[in-house]
Amino acid sequence: MRAYLDLLQHILDNGGDKGDRTGTGTRSVFGHQMRFDLSKGFPLLTTKKVHFRSIVIELLWFLKGDTNVKYLQDNKVTIWDEWATAEQTARFGRPEHELGPVYGHQWRNFGATKNADGTYNQDGFDQIKWLINEIKTNPNSRRLIVSGWNPNEAGQVALPPCHTLFQFFVQDNKLSCQLYQRSADVFLGVPFNIASYALLTHMIAQVCGLGVGDFVWTGGDTHLYANHFEQAKLQLTREPLPLCQLKLNPEVKDIFDFKFEDIEIVGYESHPAIKAPVAV
């Protein structure tokens, strides 16, 4: 994954320093693209260890349409904890652990009506179910899009969706995906996002009877936080290792039937993890 290291170097060398919502400060570029051929290996970063289990559990959580972090915490995944404290959720009139209309809600219940107590009815549009059917029945469509960004609700959550929109493309019986990420925390978030959407592409390809093509990552505000510069420089001293392979249970034919046990990576080798603080 040399392209990722090239992005780190590009931001350090050419990015502009600016303030940000968290008060940490960033060095940013606007508009960047990376392409990964999924047939040549699974794009899980090797120049630092990435916790694949957290990526899988989070994606299954999204696909469930869940917005409460209890499922994550029950599975010992803590990546959303900073935004699910009582202090954070109280800002939006929600109980501790309830994030509101974040990814899972938008994917599975977009535009749902809201009750007086702040809960949502299950009367929204299921974008994932629609997408799967459309790929199966109309693979040449240029409308194979899922949006996590609902402008009417973006201000009602502690962290509005960063990876906002993704589109699929079928050619030669292979499924490709492009993600647009409005805000890209390149050191901590982007390695997770690349692997998560590559995994989703494999899963959807399997249930639609397709092979895999490319995953294209496109970033808007593409940045390194100021307190990640030294970690990025350390990572740039490391040579990428061969990519691992993804193995899915071939018996799973429905996207909503996947369980953690159905998903594994084979041959993952990496350099040691590099710790860095999360900006909230």
Curated annotation (Swiss-Prot):
Keywords: Cytoplasm, Methyltransferase, Nucleotide biosynthesis, Transferase. It comes from the Bacteria. It catalyses: dUMP + (6R)-5,10-methylene-5,6,7,8-tetrahydrofolate = 7,8-dihydrofolate + dTMP. Pfam families: Thymidylat_synt (PF00303). Disulfide bonds: none annotated. Pathway: Pyrimidine metabolism; dTTP biosynthesis. GO terms for biological process: dTMP biosynthetic process; dTTP biosynthetic process; methylation. Its EC number is 2.1.1.45. The active site is at residue 162. It is an enzyme of class 2 (transferase). It is found in: Cytoplasm. One of its GO terms (molecular function) is thymidylate synthase activity. Homodimer. Belongs to the thymidylate synthase family. Bacterial-type ThyA subfamily. NCBIfam families: PRK01827.1-3, PRK01827.1-5, thym_sym. This is Thymidylate synthase.
